[in-house]
Amino acid sequence: MTTSGALFPSLVPGSRGSSTKYLVEFRAGKMSLKGTTVTPDKRKGLVYIQQTDDSLIHFCWKDRTSGTVEDDLIIFPDDCEFKRVPQCPSGRVYVLKFKAGSKRLFFWMQEPKTDQDEEHCRKVNECLNNPPMPGSLGASGSSGHELSALGGEGGLQSLLGNMSHSQLMQLIGPAGLGGLGGLGALTGPGLASLLGSSGPPASSSSSSSRSQSAAVTPSSSTSSARATPAPSAPAAASATSPSPAPSSGNGTSTAASPTQPIQLSDLQSILATMNVPAGPGGSQQVDLASVLTPEIMAPILANADVQERLLPYLPSGESLPQTADEIQNTLTSPQFQQALGMFSAALASGQLGPLMCQFGLPAEAVEAANKGDVEAFAKAMQNNAKSDPKEGDTKDKKDEEEDMSLD
């Protein structure tokens, strides 16, 4: 996972390595599911949860003997639940169950004592569904006056206007704009560019999507044939779980150098804490979530051309087939509807104009975004779509011209 690059490379270079401090970690092995039976993988393993510098939460499992990380799942709030399997005789089997689809991952505890099993389970659910705010773990950052200067009148728009397309995509992607990362993963980079939100941080913990966690890297390994100790007797020495020291342990986490470059994550933090004001002139705001209801979307999604255009933006994964039904499930999910509402609020704030300009939207759409007029923005996008010739029509017309030239 790459870290966010500096927005101002002309300043003294600085870097932020990925945080190596685990939010939760405990020794546990994997289990393979065949039919209705789970079989333990006897390898010594470690389950841990880590928050990287892009604010994403990773649920990981690694082989403690080889050090190989076999599972690295990006999880968003309300994606899944970690709970004990009551049908297991030993009582030490737990399952990570995704709320969307049938994806389930089973683990068996390898800690010598059982008294912390339920506490580990509670911490896992807490970290997955209520992740800590970025920077709350002591990661170094830019000084307060630098961040407040960015949020000044005109400063933020000027900064956004000078950002490259790739930086904007990173900003509005998995970790950008109020933590609406689930939506970015849900719809892919093409649609995520228009579906960020600068809503208050209180809503960011619930604005998730089940998608990218399902676009996780599925484990490709099965039960190993190597001779290992019995599951009930983990070795004391080799089973000691590694706990790397946090990268910010040099004592300078709270006093950043004035010349330290402002990082992309700093701007994300600013946008995440921005208050969305009421619409200009007290005009009534349009909530896209109340407009794009499942009933209205159903006939649109039934169109084969629409399906063909949306399919590439669906996540690919073992339990997420790229089908028309999956499009329907995605766009009618509560998470997507909530994200639409948050995007409506952000658009109505009048602060997304510079971003819309960067994405090459028509002048009418940019002007509407600057005014916070959601209805005018939608009409501008609709008019632009009507004025652009369809790819198929252009191709047919070109073929006709070639045929005429041959005659």
Swiss-Prot record:
Residues 362-407 are annotated as: Interaction with UCHL5. This is Proteasomal ubiquitin receptor ADRM1. Present in all tissues examined (at protein level). The modification N-acetylthreonine is found at residue 2. Residues 387-398 have a biased composition (Basic and acidic residues). Belongs to the ADRM1 family. The modification Phosphoserine is found at residues 15, 140, 211, 405.
